[in-house]
């Protein structure tokens, strides 16, 4: 009986051993909970690795199955449509093939398109084009030996604009207006920002159809589609996109110059892709500050250089090992406004329509007031600002060949000369030239040394070959000969005396091989003592300094 008596004093809470347990048991449960939690946390990355391993195995199996079913070329074409690289084609990815087979294309679905007033002003643009001169291509010299006819099929058949005339709403050109905080003459901004740099690399070549344009890309895509149905608003190589600069301003209008880097893919399946990359699209627009009226619009590919288009095409299923490259001359590619934008209807003070442009009728006649600019820049200066925005290496002036030597002689400086196939300051530039301008040539230490001790210049090989044969200008002809004597493909950097003597030179490929970082290289990748310089920057500075040293005996004599 005594065992059944509860001897707990009155007012005290009774311990429930079954529910609460001893302190040691509570500690045991706590340890178990902690260990379980740690185990779960540790297991998560293991599970993730296992899942990734499983997915990778499945992807490899699908790739092998695709290769077995389609062959290398077939899988290449499949991959060009498979934009998310999952080895499955969604209806959206299959759409280009459906359009090709049926001949029917659904209306384009552009994202983020700005709504337009159906009664607003409209602008009519006309496209003009002269096809690329095939004889200007390097491979034409041997009759395109080794180049299959199918590779150039898209280029040979492209003789005229895809759309000769098209009408746009004036409000669509709102994309060219400056953003907030950019309203002063000389201000520059990105209309379409570049998403590539030396670290991101470039976009793939094995694509046939451009992605759906978004936002401000929509108008640019529509404009370029007047030339060819497959424009890529974002080019494969940096700098991509479009930049703009306010050239002039008045109370109600802006005059804006702009520069666009875009390209076209010319071939259809079953031929492999052919990329046609103009050096740039330059242009200007005069529009009201509310984008309700466009006074003038013009966009064109500059044709003032002997070569202005880069071309690259695949002739096999491997993206890198089966690539051909050439450069050529495009005489004309431009869009121009028929006249200022005009309203399709006019209303009197009572809101009654008093005149209308009927279908097939004569256009309404308007008289436009003269625009008086309150502030403006020379067009050349505005274009230079665009150039520096896209290419920081142009913070140093690069003068034409003849002008560079005249300036060097007057200032008693050396000429820092770069000789290459494509223009250094546009998209017709070759691969090693692109690497140079995106790395060493834009680095602050190199810019400072070039500004202090050199006159800089770049030249096309073709231009110096022509200059070498100019019997009317013996002095410049000799300078061109001395340059070409030291030139090796594709890019040669030189330190040259004002009289044309080359005192130091290096090939771009050799330079890049010397400065590329390899896993087996010893030592730090950056020189902290030199202000965080990378190896290529310090090597280029050493190249320039060696040139200065070698030139001393000539300059002091």
UniProtKB/Swiss-Prot annotation:
One of its GO terms (cellular component) is endoplasmic reticulum membrane. Disruption phenotype: Emrbyos show disruption of muscle architecture and greatly reduced motility. Embryonic muscle tissue display disorganization of the sarcomere and myofiber attachment defects. Embryos show a defect in the generation and development of slow muscle fibers and a decrease in the expression of myogenic lineage genes in slow muscle cell precursors. It is found in: Endoplasmic reticulum membrane. Its main location: endoplasmic reticulum. Residues 1-21 have a biased composition (Basic and acidic residues). The chain crosses the membrane at residues 35-55. Coiled coil: none annotated. The keyword Endoplasmic reticulum applies. Residues 1-28 are annotated as: Disordered. Keywords: Endoplasmic reticulum, Glycoprotein, Membrane, Oxidoreductase, Selenocysteine, Transmembrane, Transmembrane helix. One of its GO terms (biological process) is regulation of ryanodine-sensitive calcium-release channel activity. Glycans are attached at residues 451, 499. Signal peptide: none annotated. It comes from the Eukaryota. GO terms for molecular function: oxidoreductase activity. Interacts with ryr3. Plays an important role in cell protection against oxidative stress and in the regulation of redox-related calcium homeostasis. Regulates the calcium level of the ER by protecting the calcium pump ATP2A2 against the oxidoreductase ERO1A-mediated oxidative damage. Acts as a modulator of ryanodine receptor (RyR) activity: protects RyR from oxidation due to increased oxidative stress, or directly controls the RyR redox state, regulating the RyR-mediated calcium mobilization required for normal muscle development and differentiation. This is Selenoprotein N. The lineage of its organism: Eukaryota, Metazoa, Chordata, Craniata, Vertebrata.
